[in-house]
Swiss-Prot record:
<keyword id="KW-0519">Myristate</keyword>
<keyword id="KW-1015">Disulfide bond</keyword>
<feature type="lipid moiety-binding region" description="N-[(12R)-12-hydroxymyristoyl]cysteine; in form Eudistomide B">
    <location>
        <position position="1"/>
    </location>
</feature>
<protein>
    <recommendedName>
        <fullName>Eudistomide</fullName>
    </recommendedName>
</protein>
<feature type="lipid moiety-binding region" description="N-(12-oxomyristoyl)cysteine; in form Eudistomide A">
    <location>
        <position position="1"/>
    </location>
</feature>
<keyword id="KW-0488">Methylation</keyword>
<keyword id="KW-0449">Lipoprotein</keyword>
<feature type="disulfide bond">
    <location>
        <begin position="1"/>
        <end position="5"/>
    </location>
</feature>
<feature type="modified residue" description="Cysteine methyl ester">
    <location>
        <position position="5"/>
    </location>
</feature>
Length: 5
């Protein structure tokens, strides 16, 4: 899951 998960 860009940019963070």
């Amino acid at each position: 899951c860009p940019p963070l998960c």
